[in-house]
Amino acid sequence: MNTGARNRRFARLKNFALLFLCVLLCTPGHAEGVFRIVAYVAGWSMPAVIHPEKLTHINFAFAEITPAGRAQLANGELEASLRRLVALKMTNPRLKVIVSIGGWMADGFSDAALTESSRALFADSAVDLLRRFSADGIDLDWEYPGQGVAGIKYRAEDRQNFTRLLEMLRSKLDAASVTQGRTGAGRYTLSIASADREYFDHTEMDRLHVYLDWINVMSYDFFNSLTPTTGHHAGLYRAAATVPTDRDADDSVKQHLAAGVPSEKIVLGVAFYGRGFAGVKPIDNGLEQPYERFEGAHDYSELAEKFIGKQGFVRYWDDRAKAPYLWNSASRTFITYDDPRSIGIKARYVKAHRLGGMMFWELSEDRNDELLDVIARSMRSK
């Protein structure tokens, strides 16, 4: 064989090998008909018992960004918690443990995303974090690019820089996957926690989604201490007593789809906690009424033990929003939450719209797995 022919044959073999590697590397971890069940687990509130067989992914919350722009765990307690979660893979080898960076009031993103060098530094540190703890991917919970609502540093250019940061992370994670022989469903993953409306004004969802394996849509907290009235904080649809400020999970999903996000990349978030409002105007059982005080959050286990059908609280169902709520007429207290019925309906919505699965915040708030069992059963049934 002459040198030219040998070189051409080598080139064809090389191209075939590269193509084969790309197919292996780029194979998505979400197979047809297999839905993700993504649990956020807070390092400061680790459940005593975790059933890994009920989950596909655990998002460990949270790593932080140092003033120097590196991703790290803040202390030894968080490191021990992450190691405990990674050890669950011995029970469920298919479980993926993801390190989530950020969270509410977590600063550092705007600086980390600012320049090519700062993005590379952050991405390299994120990869090092995965290697050190044998974790499987990175999740970014930046609340929020281009907005100072949580009191963090922000810039107008966060909109473009967030996309550039995700592009850098994708490149670094893919390179590390190749180096470590992680292919197909085993490659390092990249996801984000997203919101709706204003979030889309300050991000390039139509461009950034190509770098992501999936998006955890935070379709909750629609009504909170910043809204003037009560309402369903995690309603699937708008309430029967619709007000102009109403937001809902279905609208959030449609925004992502309109931006070009493939349906299988959309993971619908549900809440394992409720939100309370006191001094509520006593009309329509407190739904979408002005209030005097925001009373914060109640985890679902607390609601089940102390509030639902107890202490004067009556459960109501809004069939338009597909959401439950509690009303105490004596204390004029309104509580909005998700329950097994509403979560079961959301699970059917996920399957009907061919979404990528369900996510929830946060595992320790459902101590008896009452809500998780609905998700696990629904996502795995035909």
Regions found by a protein language model. Name each.
Residues 1-11:
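N-terminal secretory signal peptides that target proteins for export/translocation
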